[in-house]
Structure formats: structure tokens, C-alpha cells
Amino acid sequence: DAAEILAKESVQAVIDLENMGLPFNRTPEGKIDQRRFGGHTRDHGKAPVRRSCYAADRTGHMILQTLYQNCVKLGIEFYNEFYVLDLVMTKVDGQERPSAVVAYELATGELHVFQGKSIIFATGGFGKIFKTTSNAHTLTGDGVGIIWRKGLPLEDMEFYQFHPTGLAGLGILLSEAARGEGGILRNASGERFMERYAPTIKDLAPRDMVARAMANEVREGRGAGPNKDYVLLDLTHLPPEVIDEKLPDITEFARTYLGVEPYTEPVPVFPTAHYAMGGIPTNVQAEVLRDNDTVVPGLYAAGECACVSVHGANRLGTNSLLDINVFGKRAGVAAVEYAKTAKHVPVPANAAEEV
């Protein structure tokens, strides 16, 4: 059901973002452009397809900016630098119900209690449990941990995706857009090694396949560099104007962090911890599940911290952005509808002291 909903509501999700002002790349005819991405194929892997709508190589960043601008436009209040420490659960009619969250104000060190009829967890992933990750320093799994400490279940936590192209030694992400635009992965001898692992779709094979292939090349001694511990992302055959227009972040990152000029040099890359498939189990309305059949009234989760099970053990590139927009919207709509008729659950007087 969740996968069907994701597919059916995907077009409207893109239209919604366009209507909010997201600057998608365009075709010469003025339509939203689409590019190839890893694992996006037709006829069960027979050929790659252009499926991914994009804004240069910073689509996620542009979604963030677009949504934030619309929040400002609508006068939505943000409590910046407030760090949520705990979810307050209150027993009502013999059942634990969410009533508030306790947050730590970084500027003052004070604890604050925020009561809510509906509470949505959109706390992201937990990539910082790994040594090398594309994730920000703040993504340490706090939201998922809060839910676990409340005795609620987690789902599919063993499924974690490693993105093939992190800057070698740093983990900073180089978008799959580079390979979507024709970038080639090569080993130390210059061989396009993905032709051996995925002869049909080569460098645009699913991420798990590409990451394993890269690790195997290094393990068998075909890695590049003085320690033979990475492979090379080659963009040198692409026209500079294509790189500048469609891959600006990739070129900036390579120059800034590695001192490599992508016009003339291949970029050292190696897999980096990237995305959690598992998290807080929800139904298709983003309601948090207490078990397979029971929801926690008034509690929702969306985005990387949630697990509605659309991705399985390894998601396709760009499907995370689609997931957060489709099910993030569903979470918001469901939370509003619940709050219209629900009453506030009482908050214990010592809620902050119990953290």
C-alpha cells in the first residue's frame, strides 16, 4: 500500500513544490527536466530511464529552502536552537498517550515543555554512529532513541544505505547526479570497473551494488591513491559548461575539500554511510504504531526517522526526497485533522524534572 501511495502521489508532490517556487531545471521546451539516477530502470533493469526531477545537484537543499520560505511567508514560528530531549507520555484510561515534548534551549540552558494535541517526529537519521558519513553532526538518532526509550518499537534498523560516492576519507556526499550526467567510476588502472559488475546499467546500478563493487575493487588491490583505498569518479570527459550548470556543488566540494579540479582530474571517492531505511514504524497516514494493529493517538513520524516500509533494504536514489514530501504531507494533514477534535492530554507538573 505504501509503495503504491508513493508512486501515485509523486506527481502531485513535484507540482506542489513547483507551485511553492522550487527552481527545477528545465528542458528547452520549459518542462521540468529529468535525469538518470542509480537503479532507475525499465523492464526490470534492462535500461536506465530519466525519472528524477532535479535542481542542479542540490535538489534536497532547494526543497529545504523552498519549504522554509513558505513557512516564513505563512508566519510559522520556529524555536531555533531548542533541542528536544524527551517525549512526555501521560497515562489516560490505562494507556500511555503523548502530551508534550521537553526541549533544551541551547542559549540559556533552560528546559521548556511544549504541549501539543498532535506531535510529529521529523528528526532525521543517525549517520553519525558511523565513522564516515554524509550526514550532519546533529544526526545522532535522538528522535529514534526517544521513541525507543518510551517502550515503542523500531523497525528495519539493520538496513542502512551506504552511498557510493563520498569524498574519500571525509564522507562528504558527491551527488549521484554526477553519474546521472555521465560520470564514470574507474579503478587505479583507469578501468571502468562497473562494466564487470553491472554490464547493462554500469555506473547507474543500484547503490548497494555500486558500493559493494567499489569496496571489492579496493579489497582486491585495484584501489587508487598511495594507500590504494579509494576509486575515482571521472568527469573529465564532460564539457565544463555541463559540469558548471548541472553539478556546481560537486565541483565546489572537490576543489574545496580535496584540492581536485574536476575539469581535468578524477575525484577520489569511497562509500559513505548515508541513509537509514528503518526507524519509527508508521502506517500510511504517518501515525506511529504501537504494534502491527494499534496506533499511538496524536503521535506521528515522517522522513528518515520514520519507517513506512516503502524502501525495503536499499532505497533508490531520490526516493527519499519523494518519501519525505509524500508522507510528510500526509503526516501534516493527519496531525491537523486529529488536533481539530482532540483535547489536550494533561502534562505532569514535573515533566521537565523527569528528563
Report the location of each language-model feature:
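Conserved redox-cofactor binding core of oxidoreductases
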Residues: 18-110, 115, 122, 163-170
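Glycine-rich loop(s) and the adjacent beta-strand/alpha-helix scaffold that form part
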Residues: 118-172, 317-334
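Short FAD-binding loop at a beta-strand-to-alpha-helix junction that anchors the flavin cofactor
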Residues: 118-124, 285-287, 291-316
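Short beta-strand to alpha-helix junction loop
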Residues: 2-8, 50-69, 79, 133-141, ...
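Long, amphipathic alpha-helical stalk/connector segments used for oligomerization, subunit docking
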Residues: 337-355
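An anion/pyrophosphate-binding glycine-rich loop and adjacent beta-alpha core
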Residues: 146, 152-268, 334-340
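Conserved mixed alpha/beta core segments that line enzyme active sites in large multi-domain catalysts
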Residues: 69, 77-129, 158-160, 249-250, ...
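Dinucleotide-binding Rossmann-like beta1-alpha1 core, especially the glycine-rich loop
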Residues: 1-24
